[in-house]
């Protein structure tokens, strides 16, 4: 998304507005010392931007804006940057409904219609200054209910002047005429609102069950105009059908909301701005808890997950869900704003496999710079532009950096208890890790072989980008162990060996939770093991822990195979006979390529040698082979070692159980 689409949200606390740090980094160098604030009625204000305590703050000129639009504590403002130091501003009251903009008038300026008031005594006549009133309903628990002298179910709002009265800046219009075209939040509105259906807006903050409820004030104004199914549209143009039901006199989003929430990864504290544009259609903007507009993901169609990937990092899982960036998103958003004056392009790395020895430059950018760059170019990373994870969020504790989310990669069928999850959170809070904690569990293979798999995304990003030795130590202990990390595997994880002595010294067994803290220094990479008070991880036959969140569990299959297949533990880890393997197979871990006779089918599987038993096992990738070829109990596989091949290759001849005599 280009800078033209950047937005942030601000809740009025105090008498100034501080621009969120993340947003300030996005627009650094793009705005002047004075910015223009534009409200929906078209009026603009010049406001000075000052830098104070490493923050951008709106100062000179802000007071006039705040007075004209009667800003109060806890009012919510949405700032959308439209380029050229210009922001479009929408104002919401604390109950989440968009405020009726005050009628801003010029000092002593005569109105332009016969019968109107000859002069305005004040440059601003707010609704509260009028002498006649009518009632409107308020949502429950509204801050206005605490005001003395105000009825708990109504608020005094000005009655409009006579229809023949209007001023140069704006005029009131007939409420009956407004009822259909504008659907304004309050019963009456200004004339310009009749032609702006998006003015009918409300804001929701996601807090447990409240995120689905449409504000009562808004619901009352659109009652009878919304069908049983609403259409939610996000800025990237995608729409979602969500069922609306009436429960306890409230309108609630039901069926379809979960799909929307998952697609855009809604989390606790996110803020959503809903704009009603008629015909049961809402336009939705999404802001994160730091008040910056979220980068909207787009749905990736026909993208399958590798069947033998039972361990995924949060980033890998997010990529394999319908909620990641795709080439359509790049085409539709990143390239649209480019022209001959622009000198930049974006590349999105979808996975580790995208990191190759070459990088294709987009055709449009290549056309822009054709004939202007030499055959060899220099790549520089700007030191003053931090990554998204390095940017510090403003916090009440003085701007301390938020602790990074841990990486949960648990084997199939292993779940963490709530007590263990709480212990992880307490540990994060205590040690404030610079690199996310890596959390996994001991499974049968790890205990037997003395090996442990690491999510390759995590290993590449935080540990190593090549094969090397890592120092392993226990928190508070002096003893260290050397482990080897194999980054040459073709799967989504990296195999580490040399753990057997560590497992024995720490009395680790199957099902125990392991929490590792990674750190880097000039001497290399180190992993610190943090023991748990209650480390055993319960095993479930029905659920596995989602790698995205420590508290969310999703149903998952026990093994990647067809419904008719029921493999034993031995078959899940294909083992070759010791006699055959010692004579014909290599004696170090490597990948094996599996082929079928007279077909082009190929599959890679990890060959692991258990040095204690000399067993040769096919591990990661074998499950995919079983699933691809629909192997069942009593099927026979004949493995033929292919000679004169640079890489270890075996042809597998499959004899189905019905074919055996």
Curated annotation (Swiss-Prot):
Q: Does the keyword Transcription regulation apply?
A: yes
Has the keyword Phosphoprotein been applied to this entry?
A: no
Which ranges of the sequence are annotated as binding DNA?
Answer: 2-95, 197-290, 437-535, 562-658
The record ties this protein, via Pfam families, to:
B3
InterPro entries under this entry? B3_DNA-bd (IPR003340), DNA-bd_pseudobarrel_sf (IPR015300), REM16-like (IPR044837)
User: Where the protein is mainly located, per its record?
Assistant: nucleus
Question: Which keywords label this protein?
Answer: DNA-binding, Nucleus, Repeat, Transcription, Transcription regulation
Q: Provide a GO CC annotation, any one.
A: nucleus
Where located? Answer: Nucleus
State the Gene Ontology terms under molecular function.
DNA binding
CDD domains in the record: B3_DNA
Q: Which domain of life is it from?
A: Eukaryota
Q: Which PANTHER family match?
A: B3 DOMAIN-CONTAINING PROTEIN OS11G0197600-RELATED (PTHR31391), B3 DOMAIN-CONTAINING PROTEIN OS12G0591400 (PTHR31391:SF140)
Protein's name according to its UniProt entry = B3 domain-containing protein Os12g0591400
Q: Which organism is it from?
A: Oryza sativa subsp. japonica
